[in-house]
Amino acid sequence: MADPKTAAVGPLVGAVVQGTDSTRFLVFSSKTAELLSHHKVELTQEFPKEGWVEQDPKEILQSVYECIARTCEKLDEMNIDISNIKAVGISNQRETTVIWDKLTGEPLYNAVVWLDLRTQTTVEDLSKKIPGNSNFVKSKTGLPLSTYFSAVKLRWMLDNVRHVQKAVEEGRALFGTIDSWLIWSLTGGVNGGVHCTDVTNASRTMLFNIHSLEWDKELCDFFEIPMDLLPNVFSSSEIYGLIKTGALEGVPISGCLGDQCAALVGQMCFQEGQAKNTYGTGCFLLCNTGRKCVFSEHGLLTTIAYKLGKEKPAYYALEGSVAIAGAVIRWLRDNLGIIETSGDIEKLAKEVGTSYGCYFVPAFSGLYAPYWEPSARGILCGLTQFTNKCHIAFAALEAVCFQTREILEAMNRDCGIPLRHLQVDGGMTNNKVLMQLQADILHIPVIKPFMPETTALGAAMAAGAAEGVSVWSLEPQALSVLRMERFEPQIQATESEIRYATWKKAVMKSMGWVTSQSPESGDPSIFSSMPLGFFIVSSMVMLIGARYISGMP
C-alpha cells in the first residue's frame, strides 16, 4: 500500500531551470502547482577579455545532474516517491551558443553567453552585406542584427576557432542553444542523444523563420552557417526523448521553453495583451500578441511565445530586453565590494530611500531595447561629496526600474493599449524596495506571485501537458490561481516624471563611448570601462579629500 503522504501528492513534474548565474531543479504537483522540493547550484562565468562572457558547457551539464540528484534525495527524505515524477521540462538562458563534437560528446569551445560583445565587428561586417531590403533579417526573424543572438556567435566561432572549423569540415559538429546541449546529453549523448530545440529557442538564433516555423535557408546562406549543424525544431510541449542516466532514468523530457517564454506561461499570460516582466541577470518584458506577429516600430523584438503541442498553433510576443538588471548587483558585490551579499543592496537602499540625485546607467554590454546601441557604456553621474554607497545602491535599483519603464512605454505605443498593471517574477522580485520603486516609477500597480518560481512552473506545465504525459491540464478552468502580492504607487506622478526625465539625460550621456577600431590601432574595450570607473574613482578621491580637509573622522 502506498504511503498516505506519497499518495496525496499525485503525479509530479520536474523542471530544470538553467540560467546565467545558476541551475535549479524544481518539482511541482501537477494537480495543485505546489512546489514540493528544489535544489540550486551556482555557476561560474569567465571573462577572458573585456566584453567577453563564457561558461563551461560541462559545468552546466554537471550542475543539472547534481540538482536532479539532490532534489530527489530531498523528496526521499520527505517520504515522497520519485517514481511519481512523470515528466521533466527544461527552461534555459536563451541565445547562449554551444558547439560540440557528436562523436566524443565534448564541447568544442566554451559556451558564448548571450551578454557577450565580441561579435560587434562581425555584426558590422554582416550589416554591410545585407541584401537590398534593410529589413531582410528582421522581417524573417523579428530580431535586429545584434551581438545578442546566436547566429553571430556561431559565425564568430567558425571564423576564429580552428578546431571548430575542422570539426565542421569533418561533419562532427553540432550546434545548439543550452536546451539543445542539455537534451542531447540527457537523452544519451553520443549513444543516441536527441539533437533538438523548441520553437521559442530557435526563434532567438536569427536563423529561424518565425512565420514558416522552419530554419531559413536564405538566412543560413547569409550567415554562412551549414544547415546540418542545426537541431531539429519541435513544439514546446511534446516528448523529445527519455533521460538515460541518474535518478530519473526513463522519465521523458517533454517540455522546453526559453526562460522568458517559460515565465510567460508560468504567469498564465495566455490571453492577447497580457504581459509579464522577469527580473534576473537581465530584465525581460514580454507581451502576448496572440497568433499574429506584431512588428515593433519602437525598438522591441518580435518572438515566438510558445507552441504548446505538435498540432497547436504558435503564439507570438513583443519583447523588450534589458541586458543588465541583477547583473548590476553582482557587479557591485564582486567588482566594487560595496555589498557582501546580494541581499545587502536592499538594506543599503532602504537606509537612505533616495539616490540623492545620483543616476546609474549600467550599460556594461551596451544598451538593448529600445535603443540597440552597442557603443553605450556604464556611467554613474550626479555625484556630490555627500554621495555614499547607499545612494549608489539605490541608484542601481532605480536603474532597473527606469529601463523597465522605457520598454513598457515602447510596448504601449506598439500595442496601442496601455498596461493597467505589471505582472512580475524572477529572483530580484524578492527585493521589496525594488518592487515599490517599480510601482512608483511606472505609476501603475506591480503584482508579484508569492511563489516566485514561475519560470520553472511554465516549463513544468509544458512538460506535464504534453501528449503521452497528460498529467497537467492547460484548460483555463483547470489552471491553478497563484496568490499575489500587490505594490501600489506611493509617490506623485509629477515626481516620477522628473526622475525619469533626468534618467533619460543620463542615458544619452552613456552613448558613443566605443567605436570600431582595428586590432592594430588598440583595444577599444580599454576605453569602454573608463566612464564608470573614472566617476567612481574620482568620487572616492573627492570624498576622502573632503573628509580630510573638514577634519571629519
Swiss-Prot record:
Organism: Macaca fascicularis (Crab-eating macaque)
Protein's name in the database: Glycerol kinase 2
Transmembrane segments: 526-546
EC number annotated for this UniProt entry: 2.7.1.30
Main location: mitochondrion
CDD domains in the record: ASKHA_NBD_FGGY_GK1-3-like (cd07792)
Keyword Lyase assigned: no
Residues that hold ATP according to the record: 24, 281, 326, 427-431
Gene Ontology terms for molecular function: ATP binding; glycerol kinase activity
Chain's role: Key enzyme in the regulation of glycerol uptake and metabolism. Essential for male fertility and sperm mitochondrial sheath formation. Required for proper arrangement of crescent-like mitochondria to form the mitochondrial sheath during spermatogenesis. Can induce mitochondrial clustering through interactions with PLD6 and up-regulation of phosphatidic acid synthesis in the mitochondria.
Bilayer topology: Single-pass type IV membrane protein
Subunit text: Interacts with ARMC12 and PLD6.
A Pfam family that the UniProt record links to this protein: FGGY_N
Family: Belongs to the FGGY kinase family.
A Gene Ontology BP annotation from the UniProt entry: triglyceride metabolic process
Designated gene of the protein: GK2
Catalytic activity: glycerol + ATP = sn-glycerol 3-phosphate + ADP + H(+)
Pathway note: Polyol metabolism; glycerol degradation via glycerol kinase pathway; sn-glycerol 3-phosphate from glycerol: step 1/1
SUPFAM superfamilies, sorted: Actin-like ATPase domain
Recorded GO CC terms: mitochondrial outer membrane; sperm midpiece; sperm mitochondrial sheath
Subcellular location: Mitochondrion outer membrane; Cytoplasm
